[in-house]
C-alpha cells in the first residue's frame, strides 16, 4: 500500500527545506513509514553496516545481548533507523527516549527495570543526559544493576536491583560532549558519514516506490545531488518534487521536473538555499570576501548569531564555501565561483597577479 505524502502547505514557514532535523511531527511519521527494517535494506554506511552484521550475528549465536552501541555523526544520516534495525535483527523490543527527557534518576530506573532480556534501549541526544542520571547508567551498563535510594534522611538506604541483560544504543551529533566514563562503556562505536549521490539516488528511488511516485533514474539523481548528502533531506525534497510533478509534470518525476521543482523551492544544484546564498553574498558584496566577524555578519543579514553558527555555517564550512579564521569568516574560491564572480587576488592566493605579469 502506498504511503500518503504530507501536503505542500503543511511545512511551516520558518524551518528550512534543507534542514537536517525533522521540521514537523507529520514528517517524523512519514520517516517512520519510509524507514528500512533490516540491514539488507539499509543503503550506505558500508563500514558501520558490515560491522553490525558481524556483531549482531555473533550475539544471536551466543544468545547474548549485543554490546552497547554508540552512533554519532551529523543529523539526518540514519542513527535512529539503525537503532530500530538493531532491535529488529536481534528479534527484540526497542524502547526509545532522549537525553533531555530523562530529567531524574527515577525516569531512567523505570525504563531499565521494564526491559526484557536482550531488549534495546535507544537514547537519542545522549550527550544531553544530566550528570545525576548518567551516574545511574554506569552500573547498569557494566553490571546490569542499578542502585536505588529508598527512604529519606538518616533512614535512607541503598538497594541494588538486578536488571535483565540489555543493549544501550546511544545516538549523538556531538560525540565530543560525551563524558569519558560514558564513552568508554560503549563496546561498538560507529561514525555515520555523509552519503554520496549514488547512495542517495538509491534511497530516493526506494522511497518513491513506497510513496507510489513515478520517478526516472535521472530524476532520482537530480533530487539526490541537491540533498546535501543527507537521506532526511532527500526524502523531504522527494515529497515536494512529487507534489510538483503531480500538478505540473503529469505525475512523472524526471530530471527536468525535479530541476524545475527544486528551483521553485530555491534549492540550487549544489543544495544551497536562500539562507546559504544570503550569507555568502553578504560576505562577498558587503565585506569584500572577508574576513568579517560573526556579529557584523549577523547584523548584515538580519539573523541571530546562534542561527549563523549552528544552522547555516556547518554545511558551508564542511563543503569548502566558507573559512572560519581568527579574524572572522572568509569566502573561499568555491564561493566566488558559485556566485559567478571573479575572486580578488587575495582569495586566489595571489595567483592572478603572478600570471598577469
UniProtKB/Swiss-Prot annotation:
SMART domains: AAA. Pfam families: AAA_lid_4 (PF17864), RuvB_C (PF05491), RuvB_N (PF05496). GO terms for cellular component: cytoplasm; Holliday junction resolvase complex. Mg(2+) binds at residue 80. Residues 1-15 have a biased composition (Low complexity). Residues 1-30 are annotated as: Disordered. It is found in: Cytoplasm. Its EC number is 3.6.4.-. Residues 13-195 are annotated as: Large ATPase domain (RuvB-L). ATP binds at residues 34-35, 76, 79-81, 142-144, 185, 195, 232. DNA binds at residues 305, 324, 329. Residues 196-266 are annotated as: Small ATPAse domain (RuvB-S). Keywords: ATP-binding, Cytoplasm, DNA damage, DNA recombination, DNA repair, DNA-binding, Hydrolase, Nucleotide-binding. CDD domains: AAA. Residues 269-357 are annotated as: Head domain (RuvB-H). The RuvA-RuvB-RuvC complex processes Holliday junction (HJ) DNA during genetic recombination and DNA repair, while the RuvA-RuvB complex plays an important role in the rescue of blocked DNA replication forks via replication fork reversal (RFR). RuvA specifically binds to HJ cruciform DNA, conferring on it an open structure. The RuvB hexamer acts as an ATP-dependent pump, pulling dsDNA into and through the RuvAB complex. RuvB forms 2 homohexamers on either side of HJ DNA bound by 1 or 2 RuvA tetramers; 4 subunits per hexamer contact DNA at a time. Has 3 domains, the large (RuvB-L) and small ATPase (RuvB-S) domains and the C-terminal head (RuvB-H) domain. The head domain binds DNA, while the ATPase domains jointly bind ATP, ADP or are empty depending on the state of the subunit in the translocation cycle. During a single DNA translocation step the structure of each domain remains the same, but their relative positions change. Belongs to the RuvB family. This is Holliday junction branch migration complex subunit RuvB. It comes from Bordetella parapertussis (strain 12822 / ATCC BAA-587 / NCTC 13253).
